[in-house]
Amino acid sequence: MQDEMLGIILAGGQGTRLGKLTKDTAKPAVPFGGRYRIIDFTLSNCANSGVNTVGVITQYQPLELNAHIGSGASWGFDSLNGGVTVLQPYSSSEGEKFFQGTAHAIYQNIEYIDQQDPKYLLVLSGDHIYKMDYDAMLKYHQEKKASLTVGVIHVTNEEAKRFGMMNTDATDRIIEFEEKPEHPKSDKASMGIYIFNWPTLRDYLVKSYATDKSLEDFGKNVIPSYLANNESVYAYAFKGYWRDVGTIKSLWQANMEFLSPHNRLNIGDRYWRIYSKAEVLPPMFLTETSQVNNAMVVDSCYVAGEIDHSILSQRVSVGMGSRVVDSMIMPGATIGKNVVIDHALIGEDAVIGDDAQIIGTTDKIAVVGYHETMGVEQP
């Protein structure tokens, strides 16, 4: 049944709220949890759900993301029965170039989707941390005879201001949609996960864009139009672990949760693996001066200091006398001697000089950017 469904991952966003961490790379390529990048979770969900063909729509700073995805072999997408295709903006005969929003990105890739000839289109965001069976959502979509099914989670009133919110009837049919309301009428928030009947969506996009060049987003344009036209739109409630890591604080929190043995993400589940691009690296090395407490230290790390409740990604070096607490250090970062890092996110390949102090709080996480150098005298 899954072969009738094509997966499209929207991975072109700039991620401006992550500041320096996405200055030179796309948000889905940001490292997470020591061994992964954010997009690994969505790609792995597709692989585990039996979604064999996936298109990844990229745009902003795509080079690192494209290299990470490669042929898709790390997720099993290099077989004869499927594959992964990176879809980038291009100039058409109509002069179209960059994607203006989620719906516009799908419209611009109609030709690719038509080549796959799916009955259902699964549209996903490439910047969330979660594990989800999309096949179960497809079965729900079919049982409801829906035209569109939206994945939803329950959120607080305060959180609702950041999401598209939905009101439903007793059968979970969506009767009203509000984009980031000040006073939400329900607690059901869109996860940015959609299953469309492709012929219906295709017809809508072609007709709408022919008359309205401002067509941009699913939340702003498509869902309200579906509801206005009395299409059958249903909410699919997801009850597992799901995190939107679009802000510095939420990215830090999700990494700290990752350290907990009671984390609902259950990364050790052998029946639902999270895959990533494999690198052949030497083992980590802990010197006699090192101390590691409730931390994750992965391949090719060198540690001569103290690591407490933190994540050290691949190829991180921590000098003697340094202390890293409640922090996530991204791949390739170099930390000198007698450094204090507390409540911080340290970007990929950053360099922290001797005696530096990078100290944040739970409410204001300290950040060192991608390839940024701090506390080192420049020649």
Swiss-Prot record:
What terms describe the molecular function in GO for this protein? Answer: ATP binding; glucose-1-phosphate adenylyltransferase activity
Pathway assignment reads: Glycan biosynthesis; glycogen biosynthesis
- In which residues is alpha-D-glucose 1-phosphate bound? 164, 179-180, 190
Keyword set, alphabetical order: ATP-binding, Carbohydrate metabolism, Glycogen biosynthesis, Glycogen metabolism, Nucleotide-binding, Nucleotidyltransferase, Transferase
Give the enzyme's main class according to its UniProt record, as a single word.
transferase
Which reaction is catalysed here? alpha-D-glucose 1-phosphate + ATP + H(+) = ADP-alpha-D-glucose + diphosphate
The UniProt record lists the EC number as 2.7.7.27
Alphabetized InterPro entries for the sequence: ADP-Glc_PPase (IPR011831), ADP_Glu_pyroP_CS (IPR005836), GlgC_bac (IPR023049), GlmU/GlgC-like_hexapep (IPR056818), NTP_transferase_dom (IPR005835), Nucleotide-diphossugar_trans (IPR029044), Trimer_LpxA-like_sf (IPR011004)
Q: Which Pfam families match?
A: Hexapep_GlmU, NTP_transferase
SUPFAM superfamilies, per database record: Nucleotide-diphospho-sugar transferases, Trimeric LpxA-like enzymes
* Protein origin, superkingdom: Bacteria
Give GO terms for biological process: glycogen biosynthetic process
| Quaternary structure, from the entry | Homotetramer.
Q: Briefly, what is this protein's role?
A: Involved in the biosynthesis of ADP-glucose, a building block required for the elongation reactions to produce glycogen. Catalyzes the reaction between ATP and alpha-D-glucose 1-phosphate (G1P) to produce pyrophosphate and ADP-Glc.
Q: Which NCBIfam families match?
A: glgC, PRK05293.1
Q: Which HAMAP family match?
A: GlgC
Give the similarity note.
Answer: Belongs to the bacterial/plant glucose-1-phosphate adenylyltransferase family.
UniProt name for this protein: Glucose-1-phosphate adenylyltransferase
From what organism does this protein derive?
Lactiplantibacillus plantarum (strain ATCC BAA-793 / NCIMB 8826 / WCFS1)
